[in-house]
Regions:
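FMN-binding flavodoxin-like domain, especially the glycine-rich phosphate-binding loop
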Residues: 1-2, 6-33, 37, 41-145
Length: 145
């Protein structure tokens, strides 16, 4: 299962690539946050998060979602229905340049939830953050690199 948050489409694209490569389901955090946030993992299913880096830290919606998330795994996936630390948990971050402390903050949130992150990675995407006066989006030539 892949939970994702996408604002400009970059992270949606990355999550879709992962979903197609792994045959894992995709669920939008923006849609799921308004429900009960219950995750039922199938036998052998992994738990992934694809998230955009904005301001080099975890967004409040992501923190709220993880805190609200209730995880139920099959015995085969978790080796025990109460022991979720054995679930293969990973995350992929998309960023225009660097991730700052996002990875460390996200891993701590997941650890606090009882999950143990097995893999984390980042993917540099076209720059789309314009929240500060000195930051500009990438020129067209850079986007094609």
């Amino acid at each position: 299962m892949i939970y994702y948050l996408s604002c400009t489409g970059n992270t949606y694209w990355a999550a879709k690539q992962l979903s197609e490569a792994t045959n894992e389901r995709m669920i939008s955090i923006a849609d799921a946050i308004n429900d009960k946030c219950i995750c039922h993992l199938r036998d052998g299913e992994r738990l992934g998060f694809c998230l955009p880096v904005h301001g080099w830290r975890v967004q409040p919606i992501v923190e709220q979602f993880i805190n609200k998330l209730e995880i139920h795994a099959s015995n085969e996936t978790a080796h025990s229905t109460k022991d979720i630390k054995n679930i293969y948990t990973y995350f992929l971050l998309t960023a225009g340049d660097s991730c700052g402390e996002y990875a460390e903050q996200l891993e701590q949130l997941l650890n606090d939830k009882g999950l143990s992150v097995k893999t984390e990675c980042s993917l540099i995407m076209p720059e789309s953050y314009v929240g500060l006066p000195f930051m500009d989006v990438d020129p067209a030539l850079r986007e094609t690199e």
